[in-house]
Amino acid sequence: MNKQASGKDTGNRGAVTGGKQMDGFADMLTNLLSKVGISNHEVFTSEKPHLPGYFRATKKWDFLVVKTNDRGEKYLLAAVELKSHVGPSFGNNLNNRVEESLGSATDIWIAFREKAFKNSRAPWLGYLMLLEDCPQSTKPVKVDEPHFEVFPEFKNASYAKRYELFCRKIVLERKYTSSCLLMSDKQGGLQGIYKEPANDLKIYPFLYSLLTHVATEAALISSS
C-alpha cells in the first residue's frame, strides 16, 4: 500500500465500485498472512467460508483463517467481514449493515462459548467497511425523534460519521476485536485510492492486530 502526499489518501487494490470490489482486500490479507506462516489452504473466502452458529445453523463469513495441526485438529484463528457500501441508498442499507454485523458477532461468540469450534481459543473478529465518499454519504442527516431524543453523537451526523461511530462502538463493546473504516469516491476507487476518516479506524492497526493474533495462535498450535 502506498501513501499519497496528502497523508490521508492511501493506495490499495480495493475499489468502491464493481461487484467484487473487496476481492483485493481478501487477496491482501491472504498475502500478509502467508508471511506469518499461514498457507493459502488455511484461508477461506469464496469456498468453504462457513462456520456453525448458535441462533442459526451456519454463517458465511467473508474471510476465515482455520489452522490444522499435525493431528488433524482444526482451530479457528480469525473471522473477518469485508463490506462495501455504495450509494445512492445509504439510510436503510446502513441500518441493515449494523443489524447484520451485530447479529453475526453475537452468534459467533455464543457459538464459541458453546464449543462449536472445539479446542479453539477466542478467535480474532474483524470488520472492514469501504464506504463511497460522495455528497450523499458525507452531508448531515436529520434524525426522527418522535418520542425520545437520540444520543447526541447521532444528531446531524452524516452516514459516514454514523459508520465511524458504529465501527468504533463494536470494538468498544467487544463485539469485534478490531474494525476499519475506509472511504473512496468512484473515480478514486477505480485507481485503488482511499481515505481514512478516523485515526483509530485506520487499516494499519487493523492489519497489525490481525497478524499479531494469528501469528501468536499459530505458534501455540504448532508447539502443542
Swiss-Prot record:
For this UniProt record, the keywords arranged alphabetically read as follows: Endonuclease, Hydrolase, Nuclease, Restriction system
Q: Name one GO molecular function term.
A: type II site-specific deoxyribonuclease activity
Q: Which Pfam families match?
A: XhoI
Q: Which GO terms describe its biological process?
A: DNA restriction-modification system
> Catalyzes what?
Endonucleolytic cleavage of DNA to give specific double-stranded fragments with terminal 5'-phosphates
Top-rank lineage group of the source organism = Bacteria
The yes or no answer to whether the keyword Nuclease is present is yes
Q: What is its EC number?
A: 3.1.21.4
InterPro entries in the cross-refs: Restrct_endonuc_II_XhoI
Family recorded in the similarity comment: Belongs to the XhoI type II restriction endonuclease family.
Put simply, this protein is called Type II restriction enzyme BstVI
